[in-house]
Amino acid sequence: MSWRSEYIWVEFIAGSRKPGNFFWAFILFLGSLGFLVVGISSYLDRNLLSLFPSQQINFFPQGIVMSFYGIAGLFISSYLWCTIIWNVGSGYDRFDTKEGIVCIFRWGFPGKNRRIFLRFLMKDIQSIRIEVKEGIYARRVLYIESRGLGAIPLNRTDENLTPREIEQKAAELAYFLRVPIEGF
């Protein structure tokens, strides 16, 4: 999603709150909870989960391994839920031609660098760069080449833009900023 006027262009960046992340965090939570309950059931020798009779799963070694997988899955699931709650990776890119300033903001993990904020002058922008890697894991990333800061990515690497979409986005941004386009 973006917003544009004559002098200002704001590009909003989606973070971790995507349907796929919700789906995998939920599935991982349920699966790891199931493993943990089966492991505890085998230890107590009681049916806490009525799908499997506890006598069929020995605590050593199957119950211990299932408990370990359940605990590990709960840790990974809690990590995914934290990234969703904190909305890691979301933010905006603001290009202001009237003031000649570019602001790039992203939310990170809690701590000293929770707010990632880059602010630099438009005259420091050398070009817009498109990096395309084809293959099984194809990725197309749009960068701003800047003096002093190097290449700054503008879109997420997991954003699956078609070649036409990435070229159009690069052309519009290059025209708005009045800089050349480089391709890789």
From Swiss-Prot:
Predominant location category: plastid
Lineage: superkingdom: Eukaryota
Bilayer-crossing regions: 20-40, 64-84
Cell compartments where the protein resides: Plastid, Chloroplast thylakoid membrane
Coiled coil region boundaries: none
Keyword Plastid among record annotations: yes
Membrane topology of this protein: Multi-pass membrane protein
Single GO cellular component term: photosystem I
Keyword Thylakoid: yes
UniProt keyword list: Chloroplast, Membrane, Photosynthesis, Plastid, Thylakoid, Transmembrane, Transmembrane helix
Gene Ontology BP annotations: photosynthesis
Stored Pfam families: Ycf4
PANTHER family in UniProt: PHOTOSYSTEM I ASSEMBLY PROTEIN YCF4, PTHR33288
Role summary: Seems to be required for the assembly of the photosystem I complex.
Family: Belongs to the Ycf4 family.
Protein name (database record): Photosystem I assembly protein Ycf4
Gene that encodes it: ycf4
